[in-house]
């Protein structure tokens, strides 16, 4: 299989401790892997959106720490502890809205809390244990996504039992390029396609970064899934005219009450789906869900150049003011169901059911 056929956003070599990421800024015209040799490389790759998607951001951030750990030696546990905590705090600043990296950092912090009591003589063992936990995150993400795909396909088809094949609409990129593999919302679509239940997928271009046209369309063509690319402003008409059975999107952060932060444009799709009585689903692993819904969601704002330029070519007059939030928040009342690796839940029941499942 050639590099162009494999569609891996992240390549990690356990034996040699090497990490490569597919530079998604160059897709679909160029297919280039770049080395990530430590934490700063990981931070830059995330910040510059060479890698994106909440699950992939977390995995690349953590693996960049694992790569740097392999090249370092420590003699004192306090020195090791400080390095880990400082590194985690730095990685969290790369993209503030995507929650997965915050939760991954919390898991490593809790691990360190347990390891530090072992004393200086165990610092080598502690380093190995942190690397092992990080590598497990990579493998768990793929399996989690496949379960999301299966649960999501079942939920969507349950609402359209009389149809042999269905049309679905998706937004941004939530596939192999946004995760460790398979995808969340696009994983649901892959599962539907594997059941011979897809007639056509409509994907939005997703301005201003065009993750839909550059990345999702790329994945759909690669997989041979029948697909049609539309501009963001066409979504309402497509819902009216093209017999859409479901809208399924990913998430960068889901609160316990079901409110969901996702790529800008998700909110308006949810409103339009509600008007047309089309089920609207969020597909996200439990690592994207924050059961404490009292915390505010920080919405990242990005450079005006993402709106006023395309590949350095101006498309707007100099001096125009630009508002460029990367995400919006969809209220829970617009969401039909939240698809996770442990089941599909309505927003109102999600918190209590997840607490029961995750604490059992």
From Swiss-Prot:
Q: Which reaction does it catalyse?
A: 5-(methylsulfanyl)-alpha-D-ribose 1-phosphate = 5-(methylsulfanyl)-D-ribulose 1-phosphate
Q: Does the keyword Transmembrane apply?
A: no
Is-annotated flag, keyword Methyltransferase?
no
Entries under InterPro entries matching the protein: IF-2B-related, IF-M1Pi, IF_2B-like_C, Initiation_fac_2B_a/b/d, M1Pi_N, NagB/RpiA_transferase-like
Q: What does this protein do?
A: Catalyzes the interconversion of methylthioribose-1-phosphate (MTR-1-P) into methylthioribulose-1-phosphate (MTRu-1-P).
Q: Which residues form the active site?
A: 252
Show the GO cellular component annotation of the record.
cytoplasm; nucleus
Q: Where's it found, cell-wise?
A: Cytoplasm; Nucleus
**Catalytic activity, EC:** 5.3.1.23
- Name the Gene Ontology molecular function terms of this record: S-methyl-5-thioribose-1-phosphate isomerase activity
The family this protein is said to belong to: Belongs to the eIF-2B alpha/beta/delta subunits family. MtnA subfamily.
Alphabetized, the UniProt keywords read:
Amino-acid biosynthesis, Cytoplasm, Isomerase, Methionine biosynthesis, Nucleus
Identify the Gene3D superfamilies for this entry: translation initiation factor eif-2b, domain 1 (1.20.120.420), Translation initiation factor eif-2b, domain 2 (3.40.50.10470)
Name recorded for this polypeptide: Methylthioribose-1-phosphate isomerase
The pathway where this protein functions is: Amino-acid biosynthesis; L-methionine biosynthesis via salvage pathway; L-methionine from S-methyl-5-thio-alpha-D-ribose 1-phosphate: step 1/6
Q: What is its main location?
A: cytoplasm
What is one Pfam family matched by this protein? IF-2B
Instruction: For this entry, list what GO says about its biological process.
Output: L-methionine salvage from methylthioadenosine
